[in-house]
Amino acid sequence: MNIYVRTNKFTAGPPAFVTQEDLLALRGARVLGVNPPVRDFAFMDLWSKPLGLLYLLQSLRAENSVALLDCVWEARAGLKTYGRQKTAKHEIEKPAPYAAVRRRYFHFGPAREEIAAKLAEMEAPDVILVTSVMTYWYLGVKWIIELLREIFPAAKIVLGGVYASLCPKHAARLGADYVVRGRAEPAAPYPAMDLYGAIDYGVSMTSFGCPFSCGYCASGILWPRYRRRSLAEALAEIDCQAALGARDIAFYDDALLLGKEEFFYPLCRELRARYGGGLRLHTPNGLHVRQIDERCAQTLAESDFKTIRLSLESIDPEIARESSGKVARGEYAAAVKNLRAAGYAPEDCETYILAGLPGQDIRSVKDTINFVWDNGGVPKLAEFSPIPGTPLFEAAARKLPALRSEPLLQNNSVYCSYFSHDITPAELQELKDMTKRRL
């Protein structure tokens, strides 16, 4: 029977918007999930997996056959630390908006011929689910949609993910048949990581959304409601990936330590009991330093958290307000002191510092960098990316209206130093040099 008739959504016609609920109504379909290649000046595998797509494929597999093509994973080119992979790349022509940017531009992923050969080996799908992440990575999304259309002309292509949620009208122009509007909590208890076979690392979200409302962050747009998963749910997600061989787990949470007495400490106790140090844990998204007292720091160390990222953003009071006032100077100093006492080295206490925000004084960035050094941490520059729908995007777009129509201009690698005119490339390099000067 025609699956498109049965779902009452997947019918012929111009690009239309659908929801996750529409996709979950699929029955008897051959479904292919695709994570596109990345096109950008730089890309690093910080335990990067298309988690939303993997949750969806897990939900669909009970009533459909599912397969996965992860173009980033297919381009793995050697192991780095803690299960991460180097990603193969080749230089490509820069798109017109980047013509003045004096940097090389790359395709991170297999070449066209390699992906085409991989797709040719697959059974033709009925529905292809293409995910997306950064808004300024849409050229890789467009590229893979065109290739998929060429190889599987009869398949219906559905575009979802972060970019599609933040820029739905722009996403509707990339050639997909349908665009997923909005986000929803996963219907599956864990992601379909087994589609990779054996894995070196796993990923986990113990909560969805964030209780804070930072002016630069899209978490509240993507997840309007903050919800903490149960301890049993979080453990089941980690267990299923450890069973596939993962010895490293990266937490994607925006607020992992919130409510630590009720959730985080019990989670750590149970992981130690189950794995006895057999799992290494990582927090690439940054921890709220206000929560890191002596007990918390000791728990992190005892539970084998290897990658600690701290969220400071700025010691400038104006910038701190845009960060929901998550941290004060004394709280940061105390957090680093507690981590050092628990056995962490300075290089283990990398601290995110924002640079390039609308109206931000470069002197405040320098002051924050020096403050981190003076208190025993290691500064890590986080260049501002104007994300559609956030208050600071609106502030940036008033100065650069083209941000509203061209997502490439939202790229954090080049926005603040080439497009915002708030900071020059030379000044940005000076800030980067300051973050390395004491190592």
Residue ranges and their predicted role:
Residues 2-27, 39-40, 179-206:
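N-terminal [4Fe-4S]-dependent radical SAM core
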Residues 38, 56-75, 102-192, 389:
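Glycine-rich beta-alpha loop elements in corrinoid/cobalamin-binding modules
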Residues 2-12, 32-43, 48, 69, ...:
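C-terminal accessory regions of radical SAM enzymes
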Residues 75-113:
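Charged, glycine/proline-rich intrinsically disordered loops and linkers
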Residues 168-173, 296, 358-373:
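Catalytic cores of alpha/beta
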Residues 175-176, 301-307, 374-378:
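Glycine-enriched alpha-helix->loop->beta-strand junction motifs that scaffold or abut catalytic
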Residues 190-346, 350, 370:
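Radical SAM [4Fe-4S] cluster-binding motif and immediate context
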Residues 30, 126-129, 248:
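Structural motif
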